[in-house]
């Protein structure tokens, strides 16, 4: 492959309350993209920010010599929905996603482009020497291992959004109409050739992570329920095992009553309650999983848009400027 296969590179950055990081982010992303032999555009998706992020994005995108495009959503839809809005706007032959918190260095962008030019459909990344808390790293490891088992898609770092996708992968993802999706797994399901590169990782310089405990739990549910029906099959297996154990315990309790007498049965009340609570807990867990799937089906059936673009801000073309005059 040569440079003519990738004529335009689109860099998509979802932004949510990143006012403090944006000036440095724009400077570093622009500097990295200027090193590319291809032309480029940088698309900033404002995901319903409440600070000054919207104004910074609009002002930067309106500059006459800017290659920035500002996509302003009417409210917060979440990281992956915002990225899908960027995919819809992007015109590039290669599309790169990047978080706005600067934990993944924009200087890695040329490496991703170079890897894509070698014929890879998706270029993933793995964070080297992660600068996150012990809790975040432990949760990520558990999620990565669980997702590899559940989806069958082997990726080393599901949480790193610094990735590159060829145009046909973007078009395939845009054809998918489900409301909840996880972009890295979805992209890999369409890719023929993939590769993962190790990239640097820095501490968050400004603000707090948007992924708290509840957000990580919601992400786990999103990952599992939007990409695989494995939990439903596991639920059937667990239900069968629990039913078998319950039947075995019932026989055992009857035998113990016959052998040990009624006094022993009275002493076993707490054991019975413990067993009962265990079975009820498994049932409630199963009902919760079924509820997740049914809720997602209901959301998909309503067929509401994933997002609503309030405004797109970009530099006016000469023809547009003449029309305005």
From Swiss-Prot:
Lipid metabolism listed as a keyword: yes
Bilayer topology annotation: Multi-pass membrane protein
Any one GO CC term of the record: plasma membrane
Key words, A-Z: Antibiotic resistance, Cell inner membrane, Cell membrane, Glycosyltransferase, Lipid A biosynthesis, Lipid biosynthesis, Lipid metabolism, Lipopolysaccharide biosynthesis, Membrane, Transferase, Transmembrane, Transmembrane helix
A Pfam family assignment: Glycos_transf_2
Main location: membrane
Catalytic activities: UDP-4-deoxy-4-formamido-beta-L-arabinose + di-trans,octa-cis-undecaprenyl phosphate = 4-deoxy-4-formamido-alpha-L-arabinopyranosyl di-trans,octa-cis-undecaprenyl phosphate + UDP
Disulphide bridges: none
One Gene Ontology biological process: 4-amino-4-deoxy-alpha-L-arabinopyranosyl undecaprenyl phosphate biosynthetic process
Subcellular location field: Cell inner membrane
EC top class named in words: transferase
Residues annotated as transmembrane: 234-254, 269-289
EC number(s) recorded for this UniProt protein: 2.4.2.53
GO molecular function, a single term: phosphotransferase activity, for other substituted phosphate groups
Family per record: Belongs to the glycosyltransferase 2 family.
Function text: Catalyzes the transfer of 4-deoxy-4-formamido-L-arabinose from UDP to undecaprenyl phosphate. The modified arabinose is attached to lipid A and is required for resistance to polymyxin and cationic antimicrobial peptides.
Protein name listed in UniProt: Undecaprenyl-phosphate 4-deoxy-4-formamido-L-arabinose transferase
Source organism of the structure: Aeromonas salmonicida (strain A449)
Source organism phylogeny: Bacteria, Pseudomonadati, Pseudomonadota, Gammaproteobacteria, Aeromonadales
């Amino acid at each position: 492959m040569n440079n003519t296969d990738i004529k335009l590179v689109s860099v998509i950055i979802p932004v949510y309350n990143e006012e403090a990081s944006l000036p440095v982010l724009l400077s570093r992303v622009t500097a990295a993209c200027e090193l590319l032999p291809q032309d480029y555009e940088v698309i900033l998706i404002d995901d319903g920010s409440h600070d000054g992020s919207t104004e910074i994005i609009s002002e930067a995108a309106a500059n006459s010599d800017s290659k920035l495009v500002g996509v302003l959503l009417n409210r917060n839809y979440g990281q992956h929905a915002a990225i899908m809005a960027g995919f819809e706007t992007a015109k590039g032959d290669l599309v790169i996603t990047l978080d706005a918190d600067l934990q993944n260095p924009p200087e890695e962008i040329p490496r991703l482009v170079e890897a894509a030019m070698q014929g890879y459909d998706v270029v993933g990344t793995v964070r080297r020497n992660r600068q996150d808390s012990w809790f975040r790293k432990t949760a990520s490891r558990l999620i990565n291992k669980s997702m590899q088992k559940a989806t069958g898609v082997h990726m080393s770092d599901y949480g790193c959004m610094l990735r590159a996708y060829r145009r046909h992968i973007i078009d395939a993802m845009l054809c998918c109409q489900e409301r909840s999706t996880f972009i890295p797994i979805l992209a890999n399901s369409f890719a023929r050739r993939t590769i993962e590169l190790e990239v640097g990782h820095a501490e968050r310089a400004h603000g707090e992570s948007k992924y708290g405990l509840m957000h990580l739990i919601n992400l786990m549910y999103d990952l599992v329920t939007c990409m695989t029906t494995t939990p439903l099959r596991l639920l059937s297996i667990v239900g069968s095992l629990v039913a078998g154990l319950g039947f075995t315990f019932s026989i055992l309790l009857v035998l113990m009553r016959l052998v040990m007498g009624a006094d022993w049965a009275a002493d076993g009340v707490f054991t019975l309650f413990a067993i009962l609570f265990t079975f009820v807990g498994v049932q409630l867990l199963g009902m919760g999983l079924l509820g997740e799937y049914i809720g997602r089906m209901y959301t998909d059936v309503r067929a509401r848009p994933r997002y609503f673009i309030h405004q797109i801000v970009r530099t006016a073309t000469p023809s547009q400027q003449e029309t305005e005059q």
